Amino acid sequence: TGAVVIALGRHASGVMANDQHLADMIIDAGEESGDRAWQLPLWDEHQSCTKTRYADLANIGGGREAGTIHAAAFLSKFTNDYKWAHIDIAATASHSSPVKAGTGRPVPLLSELLLSKKLK
């Protein structure tokens, strides 16, 4: 989301997860690979942004606040009992200027996560 660019700039991807161990593994893999990630909260209070009178779920909040967290709250409605994480790469996946191109991120982070063999 563009909201993660506002929150973190272009130096780190945002991470939200329903499992702290998974979030920690992602953040550690980011540090190890140089493809940093920073955890943002995903509290029960954030779930209210998915309520709407027009549909079963809203996929966007009603204002400017917590946009990246609202995206994770929406995704959480489809995860049931799984451990999951949302890595918001809008800030890190592309160059802003002068070159408009992909950076390849979060490939280093995800590669480190998979190669670390800590996933269970």
Q: Language-model segments: which ranges?
A:
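A generic structural signal for tightly packed, nonpolar segments enriched in small/aliphatic residues
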Residues: T1-K120
